[in-house]
Amino acid sequence: MRRGEGPAPRRRWLLLLAVLAALCCAAAGSGGRRRAASLGEMLREVEALMEDTQHKLRNAVQEMEAEEEGAKKLSEVNFENLPPTYHNESNTETRIGNKTVQTHQEIDKVTDNRTGSTIFSETIITSIKGGENKRNHECIIDEDCETGKYCQFSTFEYKCQPCKTQHTHCSRDVECCGDQLCVWGECRKATSRGENGTICENQHDCNPGTCCAFQKELLFPVCTPLPEEGEPCHDPSNRLLNLITWELEPDGVLERCPCASGLICQPQSSHSTTSVCELSSNETRKNEKEDPLNMDEMPFISLIPRDILSDYEESSVIQEVRKELESLEDQAGVKSEHDPAHDLFLGDEI
């Protein structure tokens, strides 16, 4: 029995050793593949880095060559063949990869007619812009900035700036802190849009009694009070437009506002380019009708024609005289169809 049991355990041990050896070989092969894969990735990264460096070097060489070539082309100017007095400006652009080389050239030639001496001048300005034409822009619109800041626009860069305090110079409402508005070029509180001095873009932005007009001292339009009598005003080129009410005027920004109600814009003189607000003819007649008629100032009222006297028919004196005549006629009991005194008073010819 013991002899029969000997070979079986021996075979089991051999089988176990074989399995362990296979597992070790598999593990060794897997680790080798991992090491080979990581080494391949490193080689690829180094290769990509070398290619990027070579690309940058090529771009730098091309830019230098483009600048030299541009300078050669610009310098090939025969000043002797130019006219005695000459001026020229030119701009050229050369695309190199993802960059643009801009060259500005100015050529001047001035000849003194008395002495015959000639002065030559050549100015060359070269600049390089990236392919994406990026500038130092921290923001593009005001919403790009955090609360309490606004986007300040300039030629070369846009930056987020802190909002301005009260009575500080401004050109936009967003520049002022909190609930302030830009009024007459200063940040102020306790104002609402449409009031006197607030910034506007068209006539609908302003309250009644004001109009949207440019101000030379501010360089942007604001809601401006309508001018009164004697003040400069907006005078349309067509005189017939003076009869049109303000509601029918265009909605765009004006250089000057039209006159207030009851006034009309008239030139100061035939040679003057400035117009001022004056009382309209209807308003003048209305004021004259409201004034009591002084008989001492018009001693020859019976000689005034009827059409002129009709302007004063509604005056208090005329009304009182007419009532007296009617009262006398009623008392006499006779109402004559043709009363010479009445006709004489109304200015009929005798």
UniProtKB/Swiss-Prot annotation:
Enumerate the residue ranges of region (DKK-type Cys-1): 139-187
Q: Name one GO molecular function term.
A: receptor antagonist activity
> One Pfam family this chain carries?
Dickkopf_N
The free-text tissue note of the record is: Expressed in eye lens.
Q: Keywords in UniProt for this one? A: Coiled coil, Developmental protein, Disulfide bond, Glycoprotein, Secreted, Signal, Wnt signaling pathway
User: What ranges does the record give for the region DKK-type Cys-2, renumbered to this chain?
Assistant: 200-277
Residues the record marks as carrying a glycan: N88, N98, N113, N196, N282
Indicate where this protein resides in the cell: Secreted
Q: How does it assemble?
A: Interacts with LRP5 and LRP6.
Its function, per the record, reads: Antagonizes canonical Wnt signaling by inhibiting LRP5/6 interaction with Wnt and by forming a ternary complex with the transmembrane protein KREMEN that promotes internalization of LRP5/6. DKKs play an important role in vertebrate development, where they locally inhibit Wnt regulated processes such as antero-posterior axial patterning, limb development, somitogenesis and eye formation. In the adult, Dkks are implicated in bone formation and bone disease, cancer and Alzheimer disease.
Q: What is this protein called?
A: Dickkopf-related protein 3
State the species of origin.
Gallus gallus
**Gene that specifies this protein:** DKK3
